[in-house]
Amino acid sequence: MLQGVIDTHQASLRGILATGALVIFVALFLATFQFQVLCLPLINGRKRFELSLTNSKKRYYADAKGFIQSGFSQSKNGFYAITENGRELILAPKFADDIRNDKRFNFHTYREHTMLPNVAGLDLFQLNDLGKKILSHVIGYRLTHNLEWHEVPLRNSLLAVISQQSSRVFLGKKFCRDPTWLKINTDITVLAFRAVQELRVYPNLLRPVVGWFLPACRVLRSEVRKARKIVEPIVQKRRDYKAACLREQTNPEQFLDTIEWAEECAGSQAYDPTVTQLTIALSAMHNTSDFLTQLVFDLCERPNLIEDLRQEIISVRKKHPWGKATIHHLKLMDSVMKESQRLKPIGLVNMRRRAENSVELADGLIIRKGDLLMISSANQWNPAIYPDPDQFDGYRFYNMRQTPDKKNLSHFVSTNVNHIGFGHGRHACPGRFFAAAETKVALCHILLKYDFKLVGEAPPKILAIGSITSANPFAKIAIRRREEEVSLGVSEP
């Protein structure tokens, strides 16, 4: 009898486990289906016998450009596509002005849906209202002294430069000289985006679980713990110091760095100082290092343009003392930067939003509540807008600046429907002014202090991962020290 009870119990347990597994499977299966009738075509959907969107996402990773071109050939206004983030709506560039300042289209909720902040270790991408407020409020390791030609991995070298340069501005001399902090910054910049990329192929329900075992997430959590040991003692020491000054009725020293600005903005509200500092560093470093890498590759192919830029720096430096105002006179450099970004933006699409309500746009196009949407960057390569759009013309925006009605559109930091490298409208990149200044300062040092050229005859191939484009992280350049014609008047950090 006892054996019978045991057998019955085991059978029941197996039944419960089987039922639970079936429920989970069905939930995952149904989560990938779309029951709504779409007003625009869907491309790259599931193929026959595919039960999830995983293969669709992998196909998009491999050939996003082809799918986007195919989509617009079917529907000029836009289309739905299974992207790395699931189903998203890709709209024609003409709709950029319609959504740019419309509060019903929200960048922050889009980010929360796509950057996976619910995965342990990826809370760098999770900003509550206070975090958004702080980030909005707040917003090298030298290449070489070798006189002989030698090869360096450009992307990693520039990432180190940007890490030190940003740390000097944000946190002061102590942080920009701390090799542990600089390594944490560069490692997190690489690991965070790698982790998101790897997790996106998994169904939403599985991502938090997979994140505990994914190597990139595990290392990322370890790096955050290391960062806490650096940031938290400094924050606590300052809080104790201010409390002592308050008791003694003396004026505390004024700290001009992002730690202090975050503290001021947060006030008495609780927040995570370490994650805040890492998020600021991540925001400053990732896109800037990628952009500067591609910019140097572009210049390597155009030695005459390198010389023109050097002459501009020398001319401006002789007329103006080195400082913030000086870089605004580097108009050719500004044009070259904008042209590089035009040809290789950070992605094939931009202006990513989530529709908070159903909205009717021009042409009667209906955007449904909850839709994830983005604008195609296709106007940046449109021959009707930019003559010879496939050709790199460093003087393109310099010449445009001479035309009164186009002058304001020619600046590197300006945004419009024909150039959305920084987005457009109320959610345009708030850090673009700092990024522009940081890039110009770095480029002045590189151009005056180094000769550089490509390794091999072919230019490094731009990498495409889904809708994201990336300067080749594996390519090297040959570089050697040169004697600069003028001093930039900057002491070592």
Curated annotation (Swiss-Prot):
| Listed cofactors | heme
Q: Which InterPro entries match?
A: Cyt_P450, Cyt_P450_CS, Cyt_P450_E_grp-IV, Cyt_P450_sf
The kind of enzyme this is, by top-level EC class, is: oxidoreductase
Biological process (GO), any one? terpenoid biosynthetic process
- What UniProt keywords are attached to this protein's entry? Heme, Iron, Membrane, Metal-binding, Monooxygenase, Oxidoreductase, Transmembrane, Transmembrane helix
Q: Which SUPFAM superfamilies match?
A: Cytochrome P450 (SSF48264)
Binding-site residues, heme: 429
- List membrane-spanning regions: 15-35
* Family per record: Belongs to the cytochrome P450 family.
- Other comments? The 15-deoxyoxalicine B cluster is a rare cluster that contains its own geranylgeranyl pyrophosphate synthase (olcC), in contrast to other related clusters which rely on a FPP/GGPP synthase localized outside of the cluster.
PANTHER family per record: CYTOCHROME P450 (PTHR46206), CYTOCHROME P450 MONOOXYGENASE AUSG-RELATED (PTHR46206:SF2)
Q: What function is annotated for this protein?
A: Cytochrome P450 monooxygenase; part of the gene cluster that mediates the biosynthesis of 15-deoxyoxalicine B. The first step of the pathway is the synthesis of nicotinyl-CoA from nicotinic acid by the nicotinic acid-CoA ligase olcI. Nicotinyl-CoA is then a substrate of polyketide synthase olcA to produce 4-hydroxy-6-(3-pyridinyl)-2H-pyran-2-one (HPPO) which is further prenylated by the polyprenyl transferase olcH to yield geranylgeranyl-HPPO. Geranylgeranyl pyrophosphate is provided by the cluster-specific geranylgeranyl pyrophosphate synthase olcC.
* Protein name, entry field: Cytochrome P450 monooxygenase olcG
